[in-house]
Structures are given as structure tokens and as C-alpha cells.
Amino acid sequence: MMLSAVLRRTTPAPRLFLGLIKSPSLQSRGGAYGRGVVTGDRGEPQRLRAAAWVRPGASSTFVPGRGAATWGRRGERTEIPYLTAASSERGPSPEETLPGQDSWNGVPNKTGLGMWALAMALVVQCYSKNPSNKDAALMEAARANNVQEVRRLLSEGADVNARHKLGWTALMVASISHNESVVQVLLAAGADPNLGDEFSSVYKTANEQGVHSLEVLVTREDDFNNRLNHRASFKGCTALHYAVLADDYSIVKELLDRGANPLQRNEMGHTPLDYAREGEVMKLLKTSETKYMEKQRKREAEERRRFPLEQRLKEHIIGQESAIATVGAAIRRKENGWYDEEHPLVFLFLGSSGIGKTELAKQTAKYMHKDAKKGFIRLDMSEFQERHEVAKFIGSPPGYIGHEEGGQLTKKLKQCPNAVVLFDEVDKAHPDVLTIMLQLFDEGRLTDGKGKTIDCKDAIFIMTSNVASDEIAQHALQLRQEALEMSRNRIAENLGDVQMSDKITISKNFKENVIRPILKAHFRRDEFLGRINEIVYFLPFCHSELIQLVNKELNFWAKRAKQRHNITLLWDREVADVLVDGYNVHYGARSIKHEVERRVVNQLAAAYEQDLLPGGCTLRITVEDSDKHLLKSPELPSPQAEKRPPTLRLEIIDKDSKTRKLDIQAPLHPEKVCYTI
């Protein structure tokens, strides 16, 4: 009785169920079920087809359509066939093969188990067809074009942007199903037209969720659409992508009018226009793309005026105002069209380690490409110190191992020609690599090992180097000391001069007479230095900036203590002054990080190990004079005039606001030594 009830629930499912039971064998993968997507070396879809389960007597001929895949510039569009299929109501015959299923021939014992496993998966799928909540019911109503039911469910609190368990939304279902009325209702209720589908392909989704591929296949066809290729990846596709695949002009226009982004790309990197057929839909998308780009430019220009780049960078980088101003000015020229379009922007960041060179490059890429991973390319030039390693840079020549793989730089620049490229520690690279960079910086193009030319005139190249870092640090410290003495002499006249020591500038005389000869001696060529637009100098941190670094590091550990151990961490103002003493001009912010770990985090770990920190407690870091709390060993003479640095101690704050010091035991040692906690 249950089986008959299940068979009445859907139309294609019972025939598929009976076909599985009757089938004596199933052929190997890829039989008559249709072709999958063939992906080219650029990731473009070569074919989108799906098999159709047609009703008895109906024609099974595929209805060819035409789509387009962009293989580079828009003017080089190549027409490719994609899918549409006749209606699907008949399951595969016993001779047909289900996609993605292996052959069962020759294994009689496992055949029965395999067929019954698939059959039971289908039974479970069919029996669970009935929506069990409002969100699932909304999906069903959206596909059935039941406008009244959609309105009722939305009024009762159904989430208009809720996702199916496999990743799509009700708006995507209505768009692929040609249900314009439902699309209008959903958009009016606040549906987001720019949400991307989380469903990839049948087999990948089945593997990710740990279910059988047949269950995913039937669910996709019953709950979404039965005319899409099961092997194609739809991850990241928006409702506009699906409306274009359905070639529905009215729904495409409705989505665009409601704010759908025609430039949004799916996981494969394709916009809706890449799937459009020749006709009204393609014309509408081209017009919308042009208008959207113009609005986007105006919106970004207004945003830049209200929130300048320098201000954004200062939120993530402490100090280095001169470096931020130099980079911000160059980026502003580029964004507003006041730059040489035939040459890329090239920077050389000079300074000691750990003062923000790499972080500034990362934040620049984040600003330019909105967190896109492809927009930031980082190459550690210490990996290219030998001559034979140059091949890894642009790819091996024909006949050599790795020729088909391409180079580390050229391969990534193909994917994003306007990326921000960081050459970290460029002073360690082999001279032959610098020769390649000459062409890259001068002409904005690069030829890979396959002989193909990559045009990257719109890219931004940033090199970092520790060359002349000692000279820059010593000169900056000298300038800061002179400015500090000057401000002390003028403190009675103008209190604003106290901060003069924090703002210093490297003189032109120092750059020309000290730095440039060092760079020329190292890189050994003027033409290489002449192709650099800006040489940016990173200076050592001043005292106020070091205090910010300490507080930033303490805030990091306070957040970690709260998340992992439910412990609230506080500290006195004097703690930052004590930790600043651990700063080393040669190691930059890393020395502060290590000092906090040695003097604070070590105590936290020891106290936690000794069960001195109850859950939900509040800790405070305080400063004590170490001379009063020195643990003396009888074998060692007591210190007389020796001055010890202040000691940081942990105190626990009770519920009645009383504090008590934690007695953290020093680790035992075979020899009797003196410990200072």
C-alpha cells in the first residue's frame, strides 16, 4: 500500500523505480544519457545538454539553442550550443544508463543489493516529497506558479530568501520555471536577486552532503528543473543566470529592474550574458551591463570622495602615513583616468622587516578587487634564486617537464590581468628574473613558455625589499630624535609641536646620495630602477604607534580568551608601556608580538594548565616592581644594585570586585635556579 501511495506522488519517479527493478544490468557511465559539460582550459562551458525523459510517443529530439561563452574580450564571443530538452515524463529504459553510476554487470550478489539500495533511496525521496515547513512549501508553490499560495506563505512568515537543502532559492525556481507572476511577488516581498546558488553538480553535491547521487538527481529534477545538465556546475548562478538560461525576456527584464547585477559571475566566472541566445535577451543584457557599469562608476566615485583610500588603509595599518599617502595618490590617479594606460603601476617598498610592507599590498588589493582571491597574486622571490628556477616564473619551454602547467605568474595573470601582484623580497631573485621584469614593467605584457602573450597593462606591481633597511632605520631614528628635541625646546610656545617627532620625512638628499647608490649596486642596472613609478619608504614606529601595536595585540588575545575559554581579559594602562620596551627596530611589529607572547600569554597558559582560571572569570594584567618579588635562591647571591625590568602579574577579579593575585608556580628544574614570573 505504501509503495502504491509513493508511486502516485510523482510522475517520472514510478517508472524510474520500476525500471531499476526490472533492469538486468546497467551500462557503464556515459551511455545514452547525454553529454556533460566539457570545460576548456579557460573554464568556459563547451556544451550544456541534458537527457529528456519524454512521454510515450513523444519525440525525444533535443531542441538546440545557442548560447555564448566569453573567451577573452567581449568582441571575441564564440557561439556554443547549450541545452533545452523536451518534457521529461518517461524514465530510462532498461538499456539506458543513469549518469554517474558504475556498471553492475558480472556481480550477481551485489546487483540485487545495489538495485534495492537505489530503489529505497528513491522511495525515501518520493515519500518525503510533502513539504514539512513553510519554506519548503514556498519552493513548491513557486515552481507550481501558485501565486495565491506564495502570498499566503509569505504573509505567514515564510523566509523569502530561504534556501532549499541543496542550495537554491524560491526566486531561482520561479525564474527557471517561467513563472513571472511569482517572480514579481517574491521581488516585491524582498527577495534578493543577487544571491548565488549553492548547488554545484549532482555528483559533487551528493559527495558533499553524503547522500546517494540518485537522490540528489531526483530532487533536483522534481524540486527545481529537469532540463539542466546534471554534470554542469551551477554554483554561484543567480536568478538572472537561470532566467537567461530559460530565455525568458519578461523575467530577465523584471529582475534587472529590481536591481539584479548583470555583471555578477558564477563560480565558473561567467556573467548572465555569457549564456544568452542571440535575440532580445542578449540586447537587453548588453544595454543593462553598460548602464550598470556607469552607475557603478558613479557610486564608487562618490564612495571614494566620502571615504578616501588613505582613510581605509589607516584602519588596517598602524603608522606609515607617508607610505599610505604615496600609494593612495598613485591609485587615485589610476582610478580617475589620470595615468598612462600603456604602462602598469610599479612600486618598490623599502624598509625593515615587520613594519607593514606586505600588509599595505594586501589592503591595496582588497580595496581594488573587493576581497576577490584572484585579485591578489603573491610570489616569494626567494623561490627564484637559481637560474633554472626562472622557468617556474613564466613556464617551461616546449619539450621540458611542466610545459603544459604554465608559469606561476603567467597562469594567474591570465585569470586576472588587472591583479595586484606582490613580488616579496625581490632582492633575493636571480638577475634573469629581473630581466623578465624589465619587459613586464615597461610594456605591460609577458610571454609565457607556450609563446602566448599576456596583456597586463592594467595590473599593479609591488616589490618589497630589505635593501638599505638599516640605513633607512638609522636615518629615521636620527630625524625623530632631532624633532623630539626641537619639540621639547618649543613646548612652552606651542603644545602642538609635541607630536612633531611622530611625523618625519626622508629628505631628497638622503634618497639620492645614500639610498640610490645602494639600490644600483644591488640591482646593477639603471633601466630596472627607472621603470619604478614610486619608491616608498617605511620608517620605524614611534612610541605612540608602538602603544597602538601593543593594544592591538592584547585585544587579539582578549578576544581569543573570550571565544575559547570564556575568560574576560583586562589590563592596566602601564602594561602597554612595559611591553613597548620589547620593541626591536630590526624586527618591527613582530618583536611586539613575541614580547606579548613571552610576558603575557605564557602566564595565561601556565595558569590555565594549573586550573587557576575558572570558566567565566575576569582577569587583569598589572605591573609590579620586580625587585620586590624576586624569587631568591640560597646558592645565588642576592642582587644589590642590579635593576630588573618591571614584572607583569595576573589578578583575578571576584564577583564582589575584589582582586587576588594568582600564584602561578614556576616549572620545576633539576637545578636550583632563580625564577622571575
From Swiss-Prot:
Its EC number is 3.6.1.-. One of its GO terms (cellular component) is mitochondrial intermembrane space. Proteolytically cleaved by protease PARL. ATP-dependent protein disaggregase activity is stimulated by PARL-mediated cleavage of the N-terminal autoinhibitory peptide. It comes from the Eukaryota. Disaggregase activity is inhibited by ADP. Keywords: Acetylation, ANK repeat, ATP-binding, Hydrolase, Mitochondrion, Nucleotide-binding, Repeat, Transit peptide. One of its GO terms (molecular function) is ATP-dependent protein disaggregase activity. Residues 85-104 are annotated as: Disordered. One of its GO terms (biological process) is granulocyte differentiation. Residues 92-126 are annotated as: Autoinhibitory. Residues 1-50 form a transit peptide. ATP binds at residues 316, 318, 353-358, 425, 466, 531, 590. ANK repeats lie at residues 133-162, 166-195, 235-265, 268-297. InterPro entries: AAA+_ATPase, Ankyrin_rpt, Ankyrin_rpt-contain_sf, ATPase_AAA_core, Clp_ATPase_C, ClpA/B, ClpA_ClpB, P-loop_NTPase. SMART domains: AAA (SM00382), ANK (SM00248), ClpB_D2-small (SM01086). Residues 477-505 are annotated as: Regulatory. It catalyses: ATP + H2O = ADP + phosphate + H(+). Widely expressed, with highest levels in testis. Also expressed in heart, skeletal muscle and kidney. The record marks 126-127 as: Cleavage. It is found in: Mitochondrion intermembrane space. The ankyrin-repeat region is necessary for ATP-dependent protein disaggregase activity. It plays an important role in stabilizing the substrate-bound homododecamer by mediating contacts between the two homohexamers. Homododecamer when substrate-bound; the homododecamer consists of 2 homohexamers stacked head-to-head via ANK repeat-mediated interactions. The active substrate-bound form is likely to exist in a dynamic equilibrium between homohexamers and homododecamers. Homotetradecamer in the unbound state which is remodeled upon substrate binding into the homododecamer. Interacts with PHB and PHB2. Interacts with MAVS; the interaction is enhanced by Sendai virus infection. This is Mitochondrial disaggregase.
